Protein backbone atom coordinates (compact mmCIF):
# COMPACT_ATOMS: atom_id res chain seq x y z
CA UNK A 1 0.00 0.00 0.00
CA UNK A 2 1.32 3.41 -0.99
CA UNK A 3 2.07 5.65 1.96
CA UNK A 4 -0.23 8.67 1.94
CA UNK A 5 1.05 11.62 3.92
CA UNK A 6 -1.55 14.01 2.58
CA UNK A 7 -3.14 14.69 5.98
CA UNK A 8 -0.02 16.20 7.48
CA UNK A 9 2.19 16.91 4.49
CA UNK A 10 1.62 20.65 4.98
CA UNK A 11 3.82 20.58 8.08
CA UNK A 12 6.01 17.67 7.07
CA UNK A 13 8.42 16.92 4.22
CA UNK A 14 6.93 19.24 1.60
CA UNK A 15 9.51 21.76 0.35
CA UNK A 16 10.34 21.97 -3.36
CA UNK A 17 13.47 23.91 -4.35
CA UNK A 18 13.28 25.73 -7.70
CA UNK A 19 16.43 26.88 -9.47
CA UNK A 20 15.93 30.12 -11.39
CA UNK A 21 14.68 32.40 -12.75
CA UNK A 22 16.40 32.30 -16.13
CA UNK A 23 15.40 35.64 -17.62
CA UNK A 24 13.52 34.18 -20.60
CA UNK A 25 9.75 33.93 -20.87
CA UNK A 26 9.54 30.43 -22.39
CA UNK A 27 11.29 29.01 -19.31
CA UNK A 28 10.21 31.30 -16.48
CA UNK A 29 6.47 31.39 -17.21
CA UNK A 30 5.92 27.57 -17.19
CA UNK A 31 7.87 27.33 -13.93
CA UNK A 32 5.83 30.19 -12.46
CA UNK A 33 2.63 28.29 -13.36
CA UNK A 34 4.05 25.09 -11.88
CA UNK A 35 4.98 26.83 -8.64
CA UNK A 36 1.38 28.01 -8.22
CA UNK A 37 0.06 24.50 -8.95
CA UNK A 38 2.43 22.95 -6.42
CA UNK A 39 1.40 25.44 -3.75
CA UNK A 40 -2.25 24.55 -4.37
CA UNK A 41 -1.32 20.95 -3.61
CA UNK A 42 0.19 21.93 -0.26
CA UNK A 43 3.86 22.20 -1.21
CA UNK A 44 6.11 25.03 -0.10
CA UNK A 45 8.57 26.42 -2.64
CA UNK A 46 11.94 28.11 -2.21
CA UNK A 47 14.32 29.70 -4.72
CA UNK A 48 18.01 29.10 -3.86
CA UNK A 49 20.43 31.73 -5.17
CA UNK A 50 22.73 29.22 -6.86
CA UNK A 51 23.81 25.58 -6.75
CA UNK A 52 26.00 26.13 -3.67
CA UNK A 53 23.06 27.69 -1.85
CA UNK A 54 20.88 24.75 -2.88
CA UNK A 55 23.36 22.16 -1.64
CA UNK A 56 23.68 23.94 1.69
CA UNK A 57 19.91 23.95 2.03
CA UNK A 58 19.61 20.23 1.23
CA UNK A 59 22.36 19.40 3.70
CA UNK A 60 20.76 21.30 6.57
CA UNK A 61 17.02 20.98 5.86
CA UNK A 62 15.66 17.42 5.63
CA UNK A 63 12.14 18.65 4.81
CA UNK A 64 13.05 19.23 1.17
CA UNK A 65 11.37 16.67 -1.09
CA UNK A 66 12.46 17.65 -4.59
CA UNK A 67 14.47 19.98 -6.81
CA UNK A 68 13.32 21.63 -10.05
CA UNK A 69 16.09 22.87 -12.33
CA UNK A 70 17.00 23.71 -15.91
CA UNK A 71 18.90 20.87 -17.54
CA UNK A 72 20.80 23.10 -19.96
CA UNK A 73 22.15 25.24 -17.13
CA UNK A 74 22.91 22.61 -14.49
CA UNK A 75 22.93 19.24 -16.27
CA UNK A 76 24.02 16.05 -14.56
CA UNK A 77 26.71 17.76 -12.48
CA UNK A 78 24.14 19.23 -10.10
CA UNK A 79 22.39 15.85 -9.93
CA UNK A 80 25.61 14.15 -8.88
CA UNK A 81 26.26 16.72 -6.15
CA UNK A 82 22.72 16.31 -4.80
CA UNK A 83 23.00 12.55 -5.00
CA UNK A 84 26.01 12.68 -2.69
CA UNK A 85 23.78 14.24 -0.02
CA UNK A 86 20.55 12.32 -0.63
CA UNK A 87 20.48 9.58 -3.24
CA UNK A 88 16.70 9.20 -2.98
CA UNK A 89 15.75 12.87 -3.46
CA UNK A 90 13.57 13.37 -6.57
CA UNK A 91 15.10 15.62 -9.22
CA UNK A 92 13.01 17.31 -11.92
CA UNK A 93 14.93 18.52 -14.96
CA UNK A 94 13.24 20.83 -17.48
CA UNK A 95 14.33 20.70 -21.10
CA UNK A 96 13.39 22.16 -24.48
CA UNK A 97 13.60 20.86 -28.04
CA UNK A 98 17.25 21.87 -28.32
CA UNK A 99 18.50 20.40 -25.03
CA UNK A 100 21.44 18.00 -25.16
CA UNK A 101 20.68 14.76 -23.32
CA UNK A 102 24.13 13.54 -22.30
CA UNK A 103 23.11 10.95 -19.69
CA UNK A 104 24.94 7.70 -18.89
CA UNK A 105 23.41 4.47 -17.64
CA UNK A 106 24.83 5.29 -14.20
CA UNK A 107 23.04 8.63 -14.23
CA UNK A 108 19.74 6.93 -15.02
CA UNK A 109 19.88 5.20 -11.64
CA UNK A 110 19.22 8.54 -10.00
CA UNK A 111 15.66 9.54 -9.16
CA UNK A 112 15.63 11.90 -12.13
CA UNK A 113 12.61 12.86 -14.24
CA UNK A 114 12.46 15.08 -17.31
CA UNK A 115 9.73 17.56 -18.25
CA UNK A 116 9.47 19.86 -21.24
CA UNK A 117 8.89 23.58 -20.85
CA UNK A 118 5.27 24.16 -21.87
CA UNK A 119 2.41 26.40 -20.82
CA UNK A 120 -0.86 24.91 -19.61
CA UNK A 121 0.61 21.68 -18.23
CA UNK A 122 1.31 22.82 -14.68
CA UNK A 123 -1.50 20.86 -13.01
CA UNK A 124 -0.50 17.62 -14.71
CA UNK A 125 3.17 18.07 -13.85
CA UNK A 126 2.33 19.04 -10.25
CA UNK A 127 0.22 15.89 -9.92
CA UNK A 128 3.12 13.76 -11.14
CA UNK A 129 5.50 15.51 -8.76
CA UNK A 130 3.04 14.76 -5.96
CA UNK A 131 3.12 11.08 -6.88
CA UNK A 132 6.92 11.01 -7.07
CA UNK A 133 7.02 12.69 -3.66
CA UNK A 134 4.82 9.96 -2.17
CA UNK A 135 7.12 7.34 -3.71
CA UNK A 136 10.12 9.14 -2.19
CA UNK A 137 8.54 9.13 1.27
CA UNK A 138 7.61 5.48 0.79
CA UNK A 139 11.21 4.60 -0.04
CA UNK A 140 12.76 6.39 2.94
CA UNK A 141 10.21 5.22 5.54
CA UNK A 142 11.11 1.98 7.41
CA UNK A 143 8.61 -0.92 7.00
CA UNK A 144 7.01 -0.88 10.44
CA UNK A 145 6.78 2.91 10.55
CA UNK A 146 5.11 2.87 7.14
CA UNK A 147 2.61 0.21 8.28
CA UNK A 148 1.84 2.15 11.47
CA UNK A 149 1.26 5.37 9.51
CA UNK A 150 -1.14 3.57 7.19
CA UNK A 151 -2.94 1.94 10.12
CA UNK A 152 -3.59 5.33 11.71
CA UNK A 153 -4.60 7.00 8.45
CA UNK A 154 -7.18 4.30 7.76
CA UNK A 155 -8.97 5.32 10.95
CA UNK A 156 -8.77 1.94 12.67
CA UNK A 157 -9.25 1.60 16.42
CA UNK A 158 -8.17 -0.81 19.12
CA UNK A 159 -9.32 -1.21 22.73
CA UNK A 160 -6.17 -3.00 23.86
CA UNK A 161 -4.17 0.11 24.80
CA UNK A 162 -4.77 3.59 26.32
CA UNK A 163 -5.48 5.09 22.90
CA UNK A 164 -9.11 3.93 23.22
CA UNK A 165 -11.06 4.89 20.09
CA UNK A 166 -8.26 7.07 18.81
CA UNK A 167 -7.99 8.98 22.07
CA UNK A 168 -11.64 10.02 22.17
CA UNK A 169 -11.96 8.71 25.74
CA UNK A 170 -9.60 11.45 26.89
CA UNK A 171 -11.90 14.13 25.51
CA UNK A 172 -14.58 13.51 28.13
CA UNK A 173 -13.09 15.95 30.64
CA UNK A 174 -11.20 19.25 30.57
CA UNK A 175 -7.93 17.73 31.77
CA UNK A 176 -8.34 14.90 29.29
CA UNK A 177 -8.70 17.43 26.49
CA UNK A 178 -5.50 19.14 27.65
CA UNK A 179 -3.73 15.77 27.60
CA UNK A 180 -5.04 14.99 24.11
CA UNK A 181 -4.09 18.39 22.73
CA UNK A 182 -0.59 18.18 24.21
CA UNK A 183 0.32 14.79 22.71
CA UNK A 184 -1.82 15.02 19.56
CA UNK A 185 -4.28 12.66 17.95
CA UNK A 186 -1.76 10.59 15.99
CA UNK A 187 0.15 9.68 19.16
CA UNK A 188 -2.97 8.18 20.71
CA UNK A 189 -4.22 6.55 17.51
CA UNK A 190 -0.82 4.89 17.09
CA UNK A 191 -0.75 3.70 20.72
CA UNK A 192 -1.37 0.03 19.94
CA UNK A 193 -0.21 -3.31 21.30
CA UNK A 194 1.54 -6.18 19.53
CA UNK A 195 -1.83 -7.89 19.02
CA UNK A 196 -2.84 -5.72 16.05
CA UNK A 197 -2.87 -8.13 13.10
CA UNK A 198 -2.32 -5.45 10.45
CA UNK A 199 1.08 -4.72 11.99
CA UNK A 200 2.15 -8.36 12.11
CA UNK A 201 3.36 -10.29 15.13
CA UNK A 202 6.39 -9.46 17.22
CA UNK A 203 6.29 -12.95 18.75
CA UNK A 204 5.83 -14.90 15.51
CA UNK A 205 8.01 -12.58 13.40
CA UNK A 206 5.44 -11.97 10.66
CA UNK A 207 4.14 -9.05 8.61
CA UNK A 208 5.57 -5.55 9.12
CA UNK A 209 7.40 -6.74 12.25
CA UNK A 210 9.34 -9.26 10.15
CA UNK A 211 9.95 -6.70 7.41
CA UNK A 212 11.30 -4.30 10.04
CA UNK A 213 13.62 -6.94 11.47
CA UNK A 214 14.98 -7.73 8.00
CA UNK A 215 15.37 -4.01 7.26
CA UNK A 216 17.33 -3.50 10.49
CA UNK A 217 19.54 -6.49 9.70
CA UNK A 218 20.38 -5.07 6.26
CA UNK A 219 20.97 -1.58 7.62
CA UNK A 220 23.19 -2.46 10.58
PLM regions: where:
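Residues that mark the start of a beta-strand
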Residues: 12-16, 44, 87
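Conserved N-terminal alpha-helix of the aminotransferase class I/II PLP-enzyme fold
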Residues: 181-220
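Non-catalytic signal-transmission and effector/linker regions of two-component phosphorelay proteins
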Residues: 1-14
